[in-house]
Regions:
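Sequence/fold signature of self-assembling virion shell proteins
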Residues: 2-8, 142-182, 186-194, 199-303
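Assembly/oligomerization interface modules of large self-assembling protein complexes
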Residues: 25-84
Length: 303
């Protein structure tokens, strides 16, 4: 966009930098509260390969031989970093004639765009987790037929029938973790500690977490998904503005593998356009957001 002597862009650099990074620092960030954030290793991509655990120890008789086991070579996946950028232009007359400092709104608006983009891209991993985003096994992140490498167990971290957030459907999410096994079929002792919901579900989620008694009944039944009753472990609520479905919700354990990798954080640069004398400013960043292994997360698309 153009907002319109001699080269003058360098004289604006300090002002633009200050306006941009002051606003960028204030931009609320959600993804870091949900994703595991890492600095990217060298190179233009990240490769991860899976190796199954070993099986359980076998009983041997006195003088008997120990049986040797081998892990299963697993899935291998490569993730490439994506580049995002945007810029604006200021003309010399605009800068000189703007007595009220309106031009300062432009770096602030650019900072807001830069601050939101990582959140949008990161939470799209959840938004598309039922339909296009895949984990290392090639299945959708949330699916009904993941298969373990060594034991051949079928794992469903999505219900066969989608359902609205309720005591019954949330209980099914906790039960998923109770019955979870690793790639060798051994029990996995992981429990969810975070319920991720869109803004439309925050009231229903709070009721489920805080009500001691079962919701919507006059009986004295316990609300089994309230940590107060000691049936499920404590968990926290995260309400996201970036979940695009008004019904989908997710349970996450600390061991989940939703990963955000920074390759290059926001960098602001400037130059002058020789043909127009406009001062050009741009910001760019490079990162990747993905899920490597599905087991630490349960998702329900809702209804």
């Amino acid at each position: 966009m153009i907002t319109n002597t001699k080269i003058f862009g360098n004289s604006l650099d300090k002002d633009i930098d200050k306006e941009f990074f002051d606003e960028y620092a204030l931009a609320p960030s959600e993804f870091a509260k949900v994703f595991h954030v890492q600095s990217a290793p060298a190179g233009d991509h990240y490769t991860w390969s899976e190796l199954s655990p070993l099986g359980q120890l076998r009983e041997i008789s006195e003088g008997g031989q120990v049986e040797f086991d081998l892990p299963e070579a697993g899935h291998k996946v490569t993730k490439y970093y994506r580049i995002f950028g945007l810029g604006f232009q200021i003309t010399a007359p605009m800068y000189k004639d703007d007595l009220t400092g309106n031009w300062k709104q432009m770096p602030r608006k650019l900072a807001k765009s830069a601050g939101q983009k990582p959140d949008i891209v990161a939470f799209d991993v959840f938004n598309n987790g039922f339909t296009s985003e895949t984990s290392a096994d090639g299945q959708y992140i949330f699916d009904v037929d993941h298969t373990t490498l060594k034991s051949g167990d079928t794992i469903a971290n999505e219900p066969a029938t989608a359902g609205s957030l309720s005591e019954t459907t949330l209980q099914a999410g906790f039960e998923y973790f109770d019955g979870l096994v690793d790639e060798a079929g051994n029990p996995l002792n992981i429990q969810p500690n975070k319920l991720l919901v869109p803004i439309e579900q925050k009231y229903a989620a709070q009721k489920l977490m805080k009500n001691v008694g079962a919701i919507g009944t006059a009986n004295n039944d316990l609300n089994v998904v309230s940590p107060t009753n000691g049936i499920v472990n404590d968990y926290m609520l995260h309400v996201s503005r970036y979940l695009t479905s008004s019904t989908a919700w997710f349970l996450l354990s600390p061991e989940h593998m939703f990963t955000f990798m920074w390759k290059d954080q926001a960098a602001l640069s400037s130059t002058d356009d020789f043909s127009t004398n406009n001062a050009l400013f741009k910001v760019w960043m490079r990162f990747a957001a993905f899920c490597l292994d599905y087991k630490g997360a349960y998702g329900n698309p809702g209804a």
